[in-house]
Each structure stands twice: as C-alpha cells, then as structure tokens.
A protein has these predicted regions:
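Short, flexible active-site-adjacent loop segments at beta-strand->alpha-helix junctions, enriched
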Residues: 1, 18, 261-263
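Short, flexible, glycine/charge-rich loop motifs used to bind or transfer phosphoryl groups or to couple energy/partner
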Residues: 2, 73, 106, 122, ...
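ABC ATPase nucleotide-binding domains
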Residues: 3-6, 10-157
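Small-residue-enriched segments and motifs
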Residues: 102, 156, 170, 215-218
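Nucleotide-binding/hydrolysis machinery
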Residues: 161
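Non-catalytic connector elements of ABC transporters
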Residues: 165-167, 176-267
Length: 267
C-alpha cells in the first residue's frame, strides 16, 4: 500500500464474502477514498474489464476467466505505479489464456502502468515482455529483450530454457563443420568449436540427394498447423524440425537438413 504497488495473485485471492463490485473497490475503501470517487472508479473498472453484469455476483458464481478479470480490476482500481502479476493465467485453459493474455497486454499498455509479470511459460514471457529477466536457481541468468534472449542467449541454461534447441557435435575442418550427419559451412567461431546449436524452426527439410546434412525420420507428430519431426542424425539426441508441409512422413524416411550459417550459434 505504501509503495502504491498492485498485485494479482496466482489464486486471485478474492474475498468470497464480498460481491464483485465490493472486491474491486476494496483497495480504495481501505485508503478511505470518498464514496462518490470509489463508486465512479469501480464503475470505470467494471466497464474496462467488460464485467458490468457481474457487479453484484459473489465470487463462487464466477468462472476462472471472470475471477481473473476481477482480480486485475481490483489491482488497477487504486491506480498503482506498478503492478506485480504472479502467474495469473496458470489455472486457465489454453484458449482462455491466449485471449486474456492479449487483453492484459493491451490494457496495461493503454494505462501506461509498469508491470512485473512472473511466469514459467516461456511463450507467455516472450509475448508480453518488453524486457525479460531469466532466473536460474535464484540468480539472474540474463536480462534482455525477447529477441535478445532467444537469439543471443548468454549461456547454456538460457538457451535450453527458452524454446527448443538442436545441437550437433563435431569439429571444424577446412572451413566446414564436420559431424555424423554431414557438413555445414562454418563462419561462426574458431577451430576449437566442438558443438553447434540452432533452433528447430530454423532447421529446414530438403531432398536428401545432394544434401550436406542428412538423417532419417525417427518420429513425426502432426500438431495441426505443423508437423514436429525428430530426425536421427547418428548422434544420441535427434534433431527437431518444425515443418509446415501438409505431407505425411514415415518412420525411417531419409531427409536432408539445411541450416543457414547465420542461424547457428555456439556457447
């Protein structure tokens, strides 16, 4: 209260003995806001969250998404300098999470309120964050924009924690990286490099004939908008490929792999 910081808890922490309107106005009431100002602010928040019809309902009568909106309205009603959101979407189903994530982003940006958003969902952090702080066992591993964190991870932990990661082991010989799967033009690091890293979505399938990197399909999972392939390249860990083609893949099918040198990094 003294720091003027709002908070949205993972469990929402709404008061079951109060109506929706009373919950939203609670922070203003304990600050002894004038009654007229309190009512006006509650009406404003109800409209902003599009929950006016719920004003007189009890908390047990609300769905998970409605409770989340009430909790956010309560935190914003006091016009905080900053707001802390502690995994506010964890308890919701995937489709509702996507909808509310978009609403929260638009609302906080329109109000110009600084938000600290705690989440274990990497996609959520990438979608909402202007700056991301990656924590490793209580210590800051990296601070940066979503693009910096994803494309230029500071260390192995960050690279593996944010998104999926492919790796190939081998050695640099004559300007190319040589591994069990074949060769890759090399321009990233020095001759001492023994492992290269790259993202699944930057790994492309090409015909195996003439491909410098080759493997066989170990597994293929159709996910609707794409197929996730696990390609055996002669190493312990398969290479993951996110492929948008509509064709089906069969176990043991030979495929070629293409990775642009600029999409490869070393740590």
């Amino acid at each position: 209260e003294k720091r003027n910081v709002g908070m949205v808890f993972q469990s929402y922490a709404l008061f079951p003995n109060m109506t929706v309107a009373e919950n939203i106005g609670y922070g203003l009431r304990i600050r002894r806001a004038p009654v007229a100002a309190l009512r006006a602010r509650v009406s404003e928040m109800l409209a902003m969250m599009r929950i006016e019809p719920l004003a007189d309902r009890r908390i047990e009568q609300l769905s998970g998404g409605q409770r989340q909106r009430v909790a956010l309205a309560r935190a914003l009603a006091v016009r905080p300098r900053a707001i802390l959101l502690d995994e506010p979407l964890t308890a919701l189903d995937a489709k509702l999470r996507d909808t509310l994530r978009l609403e929260i982003d638009g609302l906080l940006r329109s109000l110009g309120i600084t938000a600290i958003y705690v989440t274990h969902d990497q996609a959520e952090a990438m979608a909402l964050g202007d700056r991301i702080v990656v924590m490793d066992r209580g210590r800051v591993a990296q601070v940066g924009t979503p693009r910096e964190i994803y494309h230029r991870p500071a260390n192995r932990f960050v690279a593996e924690f944010i998104g999926s990661l492919n790796r190939l082991t081998g050695a640099v010989q004559g300007g190319v990286f040589v591994c069990a799967a074949g060769t890759l033009p090399w321009q990233t690091g020095g001759p001492a490099v023994r492992e290269i890293l790259f993202r699944p979505e930057r790994t492309h399938l090409i015909p195996p004939e003439g491909a410098s990197l080759r493997g066989t399909v170990a597994a293929a999972f159709f996910l609707g908008d794409r197929t996730r392939l696990f390609v055996d390249v002669g190493e312990g860990q398969p290479v993951i490929v996110e492929n948008g083609q509509r064709r089906e893949f069969v176990h043991g099918e030979a495929v070629g792999l293409q990775v642009e040198p600029g999409d490869v990094f070393v740590l």
